[in-house]
């Protein structure tokens, strides 16, 4: 990941020359690659859980993809509106993305908002609400994209390639599901995916249980 900023175009290379990656292990055994950069008051973190869209129920492809779009739509005691107000107020960016093998996420914020950012990330990952209105809004957006893709030659070719290349393997199923499968996805499917995949034992990055962070943050924190 990268968090690098300078008002001097010649300062960046010197900063990079001094960059040192620290290997940290948390009290619960999660390894992180940490780079401290005091030139900008920003924190950036990337992480991944093993078990992406390949973990979707066979009859409901698209579950993991919907989860990635719903974790910011209300979690814990915060509904959709309140959650987004807190993100905006504290200049916090949370992103989630799913592939066949991984559920990935990223956090970016200013240093002064670190505690709030990590707390909002925690409740997003551990206490998503999946309220009916939010689920249906997300479902409608997914279906709109799928309808568009159903007439797009490139999308059709990509899906056909996956089917031919992988046959009955979960890799043959598109990450965002099918027009026929997405309407069948229920809140319990979403909750079940979170229970199975969003867990400490699945934290991984590039072959190990790692996350990557960079910015103006002390290693001890």
Which positions does each model-derived feature cover?
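An aromatic/glycine/proline-enriched structural segment found at the starts
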Residues: 3-13, 167, 171, 175, ...
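Mature N-terminal segment immediately following signal peptide/propeptide cleavage
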Residues: 14-46
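M16 family metallopeptidases and their MPP-like homologs
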Residues: 33-35, 39-69, 80-126, 139, ...
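Short, polar/flexible loop-turn hinges at active-site or ligand-entry regions and domain interfaces
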Residues: 74-77, 125-133
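Alpha-helix N-capping/helix-start residues
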Residues: 80, 132, 187, 213-214
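Short, charged, amphipathic alpha-helices and their helix-cap/turn boundaries
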Residues: 182-186
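Conserved, carboxylate-rich catalytic/transport cores that coordinate ions
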Residues: 194
């Amino acid at each position: 990941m990268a968090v690098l900023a300078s008002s001097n175009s010649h300062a960046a290379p010197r900063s990079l020359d001094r960059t040192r990656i620290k290997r940290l292990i948390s009290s619960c055994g999660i390894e992180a690659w940490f780079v401290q950069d005091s030139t900008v008051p920003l924190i950036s973190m990337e992480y991944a859980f093993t078990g992406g869209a390949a973990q979707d129920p066979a009859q409901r492809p698209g579950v993991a993809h919907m989860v990635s779009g719903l974790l910011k739509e209300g979690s814990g005691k915060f509904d959709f509106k309140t959650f987004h107000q807190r993100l905006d107020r504290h200049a916090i960016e949370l992103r989630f993305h799913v592939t066949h093998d991984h559920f990935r996420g990223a956090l970016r914020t200013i240093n002064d908002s670190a505690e709030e950012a990590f707390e909002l990330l925690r409740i997003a990952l551990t206490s998503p609400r999946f309220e009916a209105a939010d689920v249906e809004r997300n479902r409608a957006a997914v279906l709109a994209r799928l309808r568009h893709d159903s007439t797009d030659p490139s999308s059709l070719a990509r899906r056909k390639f996956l089917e031919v290349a992988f046959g009955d393997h979960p890799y043959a199923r598109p990450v965002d599901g099918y027009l026929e499968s997405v309407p069948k996805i229920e809140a319990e499917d979403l909750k079940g995916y979170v229970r199975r995949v969003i867990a400490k034992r699945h934290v991984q990055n590039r072959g190990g249980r790692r996350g990557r962070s960079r910015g103006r943050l002390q290693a001890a924190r």
